[in-house]
């Protein structure tokens, strides 16, 4: 088909124009203002703008300083909000929300998260806000090239080890969703908006995200039809239930693993309150998107991973909660993935990696899956 997305240069995505050579001195000066006794650390950049995903900058650092006569060496990770000129995926980045959620999850649950250390919210130091957290050693199923393409530690593992990782990741999600009274504990995520349901507020945010994405790349008739479908098929029962803490970008590509067990749950940019079905559907749908990518590359992918029946059964066994129908949430996830592809496509145009497409939907690697979910032919 003429508008079929091409795999092309998916193995190379430029995320930032930041000059990392200036970082050691800048971060050293800032750290001296937050470390005990005003210690002046020596800072080394271990890797530049690195990310398992396609959004915030992730910079790995080592800081060395003297404290109470002792030599301290700490490996840290800086999560830095992208600059507007680097075509960010999201309209806004609340790193303060991410920092506080990670801190609370670490305090309230046994879900493995990095220890968050310090946050700079003004943007005066690096040009945009950032926070520092402890570095955690682990491996992640890759996004680029997608883990479903094979030739990586997860795809090449025995099926029982893949299932072990899947179940452990669903268990982390189940634990997050079991934090009691999430609406009060994480009330800062509502930003004072208490009218309507959390799902309605989330939907309005996604609609504004799409409008933001359109500015850089053009409108999508498929997405606009999908928004109408979502409104006319609104999941009233799921929307009315007590909201839980949503990880947001809940998928295996945002977890560090050791021996097929999670050691750090990462990437909280989409954190929100809402129906638990949204996180579960996103986790399954994310794998389906990667399966679509494998299919476009004429590869078999990993069809036995993240099957809905398996994920549902594991989740219910751990929480005692029977999930509602996930179909609406798959369609909704498809819209959000399309917004990501619109913004990463606009970024690739900005950095000269591709020409601006005539048809924005040529960027949607999962367009066929979306049309199938909507009952449209493709």
Curated annotation (Swiss-Prot):
Mg(2+) 2 binds at residues 267, 269. Keywords: Antibiotic resistance, ATP-binding, Kinase, Magnesium, Metal-binding, Nucleotide-binding, Transferase. It holds the Pfam family APH. The active site is at residue 249. Might catalyze the phosphorylation of aminoglycosides and confer aminoglycoside antibiotics resistance. This is Putative aminoglycoside phosphotransferase. One of its GO terms (molecular function) is ATP binding. ATP binds at residues 79, 134-136. The keyword Iron does not apply. GO terms for biological process: response to antibiotic. The keyword Cell cycle does not apply. Gene3D superfamilies: 3.90.1200.10, Phosphorylase Kinase, domain 1. Belongs to the aminoglycoside phosphotransferase family. Its EC number is 2.7.1.-. The lineage of its organism: Bacteria, Bacillati, Actinomycetota, Actinomycetes, Mycobacteriales. Mg(2+) 1 binds at residues 254, 267.
């Amino acid at each position: 088909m003429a508008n079929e997305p091409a795999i092309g240069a998916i193995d190379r995505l430029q995320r930032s124009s930041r000059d990392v050579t200036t970082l050691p001195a800048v971060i050293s000066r800032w750290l001296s203002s937050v470390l005990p006794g005003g210690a002046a650390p020596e800072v080394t950049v271990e890797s530049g703008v690195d990310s398992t995903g396609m959004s915030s900058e992730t910079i790995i650092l080592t800081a060395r300083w003297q404290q109470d006569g002792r030599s301290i060496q700490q490996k840290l990770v800086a999560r830095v909000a992208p600059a507007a000129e680097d075509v960010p995926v999201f309209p806004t980045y609340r790193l303060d929300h991410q920092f506080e959620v990670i801190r609370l999850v670490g305090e309230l649950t046994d879900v493995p998260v990095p220890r968050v250390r310090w946050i700079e919210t003004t943007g005066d130091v690096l040009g945009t806000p950032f926070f520092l957290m402890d570095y955690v050693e682990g491996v992640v199923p890759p996004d680029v090239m997608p883990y479903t393409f094979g030739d990586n530690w997860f795809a090449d593992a025995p099926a029982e080890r893949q299932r072990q990782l899947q179940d452990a990741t669903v268990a982390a999600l189940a634990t997050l969703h079991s934090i009691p009274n999430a609406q009060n504990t994480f009330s800062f995520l509502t930003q004072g908006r208490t009218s309507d349901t959390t799902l309605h507020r989330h939907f309005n945010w996604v609609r504004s995200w799409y409008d933001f994405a359109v500015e850089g790349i053009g409108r999508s008739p498929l997405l606009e039809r999908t928004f109408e479908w979502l409104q006319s098929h609104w999941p009233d029962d799921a929307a009315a239930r007590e909201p839980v803490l949503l990880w947001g970008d809940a998928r295996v590509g945002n977890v560090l693993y050791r021996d097929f067990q999670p050691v750090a749950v990462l990437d909280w940019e989409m954190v929100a309150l809402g129906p638990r079905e949204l996180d579960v559907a996103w986790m399954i749908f994310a794998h389906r998107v990667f399966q679509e990518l494998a299919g476009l590359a004429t590869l078999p992918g990993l069809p036995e991973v993240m099957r809905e029946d398996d994920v549902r059964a594991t989740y219910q066994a751990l929480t005692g909660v029977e999930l509602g129908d996930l179909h609406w949430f798959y369609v909704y996830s498809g819209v959000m993935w399309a917004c990501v592809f619109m913004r990463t496509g606009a970024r690739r145009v900005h950095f000269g990696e591709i020409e601006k497409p005539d048809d924005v939907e040529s960027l949607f690697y999962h367009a066929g899956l979306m049309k199938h979910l909507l009952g449209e032919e493709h």
